[in-house]
Curated annotation (Swiss-Prot):
Localization of this protein: Cytoplasm
Subunit relationships: Part of the 50S ribosomal subunit. Probably part of the RNase P complex.
Keyword Ribonucleoprotein: yes
Source organism of this protein record: Methanopyrus kandleri (strain AV19 / DSM 6324 / JCM 9639 / NBRC 100938)
Cell division in keyword set: no
GO-annotated molecular function: ribonuclease P activity; rRNA binding; structural constituent of ribosome
PANTHER family: RIBOSOMAL PROTEIN L7AE FAMILY MEMBER
TM helices/strands, residue ranges: none
Family: Belongs to the eukaryotic ribosomal protein eL8 family.
Protein's name according to its UniProt entry: Large ribosomal subunit protein eL8
Record function comment: Multifunctional RNA-binding protein that recognizes the K-turn motif in ribosomal RNA, the RNA component of RNase P, box H/ACA, box C/D and box C'/D' sRNAs.
Amino acid sequence: MSKPMYVKFEVPEELAEKAYEALEIARDTGRIRKGTNETTKAVEREEAVLVLIAEDVDPEEVVAHLPELCDEKGIPYVYVPSKDELGAAAGIDVAAASACIIDPGDAKDLVDEIIEKVEELRE
């Protein structure tokens, strides 16, 4: 299956798993936003430290604006394969097209590592 049009770079599975883990840790020890509306607001306000975007969102237009907005605001983002897993990592019982970390809490080192790897992928 080809990637959706909003996916601008390939994320290795190992990195996506770390992103889910960072979101879970930040959920418990820091602050997160879940869902595209909350994520978009956090990016616009430049509160987000890292944005997670699911690759299996339908229709794509739900999250298609996020990569461009993140680039405009200088906020790193990472793609994860599953909106269901993203919702679970965010602590909700439904799928989440996107989520973001506002305060990484105990996940700070992990978030820094993810951001560094994403920057390498985008070079």
